[in-house]
Amino acid sequence: MKFIILTCLLAVALAKQESKDNSQEDFKQTVDVVIFPGQETVKNIPIPQMESVEAPIKNKCYQSIQTFKPPQALKGLYQYHMAKNPWGYTVNRAFPSTRTLQYNQKTMDLSMRAREKIVMSEIKKNIQDYVTKMKQYSKITWPRFVKSLQQYQKTMNPWSCYPYTLLQV
């Protein structure tokens, strides 16, 4: 072990001495050369560092992505609005809930509006009673496989539908 350490130290010492000798020879060669200064001034010309060709292209791509701003209508197009259901499964809604609608960068809070007394006709009262009765049926717990089916609903937009023609009979 001592022998290995000794040889390593000896090799390093010889390498340093050899590099000193080389640098002294270079210095002796440059001392013999005489340079007469000219009338023009010497300017420091910066040498550009070597850069890969791909770097500017990547920078341009990233800059264009960062500066691209999609229209306001397209921002929420593919966002799935998740609502946690109290019965233990998640429902994807096709449209945002009313509290998340935005108009001119300001959120609309529907609870801030003044409540007005609404006069309803008999038909509207019957419809409202029917809706409240149907809410009772929505509280029925479904089996686990039905819960998982409702999680993967896709929102519909005009670009995801296939055009079809009606058959004339």
From Swiss-Prot:
Protein known as: Alpha-S2-casein-like B
List the InterPro entries hit by this protein, alphabetically: Alpha-s2_casein, Casein, Casein_CS
Q: What does this protein do?
A: Important role in the capacity of milk to transport calcium phosphate.
Q: What are the protein's UniProt keywords?
A: Milk protein, Secreted, Signal
Family, as annotated? Belongs to the alpha-casein family.
Indicate whether Hydrolase appears among the record's keywords. no
The organism encoding this protein is Rattus norvegicus
Q: In which tissues is it expressed?
A: Mammary gland specific. Secreted in milk.
